[in-house]
C-alpha cells in the first residue's frame, strides 16, 4: 500500500536567496536516490519559508521494484581449462551467486565471451531506502555560506531546530547534528508558537496554514502580490512592478502583511532610480507610482505578522528609510561636485581584469571600436557623440552612489552628465550602453548607446577568450553568454550591417598589446575562431527557440558574418520548408551538395566551360543556372531571400533531369570535371541562402 513521505528541516531564519536552491537540492537528491533504488512514487511538492525547508512525496511504493539483471563473471577462457573443466574462477563465481557452474550462461561482449548469470535482485523496503535517502538529502544541501553552532560537527545555513521525517504515520530515523527526527513541526514564531504534532504527511500544509504559515511558496507569493496591490490601490497609487523584489520578500515572511508608509516629498528631486534602489536594496520596500508612472512619496513594507499598532510600526519603517534617503542625498550632492570628465583618469586605478588592464584601458579600446563600428554600420555622423559618451561611459564607477549601489551604474552616469552640462545625447548613451541588462530588457533607443554597448561587450568577449578564460559548462564568471546574446540582440534590433568577423578582428587588434604574451593550450583554436564559434553557438540556441534546428544549422553553415542578412535568410527558409512540396526540393539540392562535397575538392577552380557540355540536359541546366544566378544575385543584394529561394527552387526540374539523364562521373576526365564544376557553381548559388545538406528532408515533409 502506497504511503506519502514528508521531510521538513526546521531552522532559524534562513536567508531568502538560499531557500529556492536548497529546495532544488533536496528534491533532486530525494528523487534521484528513489529512482536509483527503483522506488516508485507520485507527485513531489516542495515547501519553503524562512524557518523551514520541506519535501512532500506522494504515493511512495512499499518497496523498490524487483528486477532480473545479468551478472558477468570471468572470461570464458579463464573459466575452463584445456580439458573443458571449470577453473577456480568459474567455481567461485558460481558459488558467489549460489549456483552450480552448469547453471551459468555465456554472454558475448565487445571484449569477448564471458560467463554470465541472470539473477533476481529484490527491491529494498521503502523505509530502508528512505532512511538513507533523507540522511543524504539533508546533508547534501549546498549553501553559498553555511555555519556551525554549539558542539555540532556539521553545518547548515542556520542552526537546525527540528526535523520531521514521516513515511505514512511512521517516523523515519534521521539525525542531523544534535537533532533527531520526529513528527512535531512548528507554526508561526509569534502567532502560533506551540508545537504541532503531525499524524501523516497529508496534514502538513493545512496544519501550518491553521498555525499562520503559508508554506507553499507559490501560494505565498500570490498572496503577497494580491495584498500589496490592494494596499497600493487603497493608498491611491499603483505598485511599481518588480518581480525580483516580490521573489525576495516572499521568502522573507511566512505570512505576508503589508503596510503603507510615506517619505518626505522633498526627496522626489533625487533621481527616481535612486529612491527605488534605496527602498529596494536596503529595506525591501515596494515603490508606488501614479497612473502616469511617476514615483510617489509612498512605499509598502511587508511585515511577517499582522500589524496591531500600524502607526507605531510605520514610524519604525519611516525612520529607517529617512536615514537611507539622507545617505542617498549626500552621495548625490557630493558626486555632482566633481564633473564626470574629471573622474575618467581615476578609472586607471580600477582593475577590470588582471591581464587585460584597468577600466581606463578598457574605455580607450571600446571607444575606438565603437567609432569604427559606427562607420561600418553607416552611422559615421554619430562619431562625436559616440566618442564623448564612450569616454564618460564608466566614469560613474568611481562615484559614491555607484559604490553604494552598483545596480545604478550608467543611470548615475546619465544624471551626472546632465548635471555637468553634457548634451542629452551623450547622457542618454551613457545610460543606454548597459542595455539590454537581461533577456527581457528593452534595447537602446539611440545608436550611440547601442554601438558603445556592442563595443564594450565585444572587447570583453575577445579579451577573455584571448587570455584563455572562456566560459565552461559550469562557470561563466564574466557573463560572456549574456554579453554575446546582448550583442546579437543589439545588432538585429538596430539593424546594423557590418562584418562580425571584421569587428572581432578590430577588437583583437586593439587588444594586441595586452594579449601578445597570453598562453594558450596546444592545438587550441585562435581567439578569433573561438569567439566566432561562440557567436555561432549562441545564435543556434537563440534561433532554435523559434525555428527548426536543422533549418538554423543550414543557415549558419552558409555563414552569419552579416547577422541581419542571416536572420532574413532564416525567416525565408523557415517559411518555405513548411510547404508540402519542399521535400523533393530538399532531396534534389542535397544530391548537388553531396557530390560537391565528395568530388568538388578534386576539381580545379574556375567556371563551367559551356563548350564541354555535350548532353542537352546539362546544357539546359547550365542555361537555367546562368539565368537564375543573375536574378538571385540581384535579389540577395536587396535582402529578398524569399524571392531568391523561389528562383533557386525553379532549378529543380533541370536538376532532376540532369541527374536522370547525365552521368556525372563520366570516364572522360574533362567531361567529368566540367560537370562537377557546374554542380559546384550551383552549390555556391544555393549557399547564398543556406547549406541545404543540413536540412532533414523527412522532417520537411512532415512540417
UniProtKB/Swiss-Prot annotation:
<keyword id="KW-0067">ATP-binding</keyword>
<comment type="subunit">
    <text>Tetramer of two alpha and two beta subunits.</text>
</comment>
<dbReference type="GO" id="GO:0006426">
    <property type="term" value="P:glycyl-tRNA aminoacylation"/>
</dbReference>
<dbReference type="Pfam" id="PF02092">
    <property type="entry name" value="tRNA_synt_2f"/>
</dbReference>
<dbReference type="GO" id="GO:0005829">
    <property type="term" value="C:cytosol"/>
</dbReference>
<keyword id="KW-0648">Protein biosynthesis</keyword>
<keyword id="KW-0436">Ligase</keyword>
<comment type="similarity">
    <text>Belongs to the class-II aminoacyl-tRNA synthetase family.</text>
</comment>
<keyword id="KW-0547">Nucleotide-binding</keyword>
<dbReference type="GO" id="GO:0006420">
    <property type="term" value="P:arginyl-tRNA aminoacylation"/>
</dbReference>
<protein>
    <recommendedName>
        <fullName>Glycine--tRNA ligase beta subunit</fullName>
        <ecNumber>6.1.1.14</ecNumber>
    </recommendedName>
</protein>
<dbReference type="InterPro" id="IPR015944">
    <property type="entry name" value="Gly-tRNA-synth_bsu"/>
</dbReference>
<dbReference type="InterPro" id="IPR008909">
    <property type="entry name" value="DALR_anticod-bd"/>
</dbReference>
<dbReference type="GO" id="GO:0004820">
    <property type="term" value="F:glycine-tRNA ligase activity"/>
</dbReference>
<dbReference type="Pfam" id="PF05746">
    <property type="entry name" value="DALR_1"/>
</dbReference>
<dbReference type="GO" id="GO:0004814">
    <property type="term" value="F:arginine-tRNA ligase activity"/>
</dbReference>
<dbReference type="InterPro" id="IPR006194">
    <property type="entry name" value="Gly-tRNA-synth_heterodimer"/>
</dbReference>
<keyword id="KW-0963">Cytoplasm</keyword>
<dbReference type="GO" id="GO:0005524">
    <property type="term" value="F:ATP binding"/>
</dbReference>
<keyword id="KW-0030">Aminoacyl-tRNA synthetase</keyword>
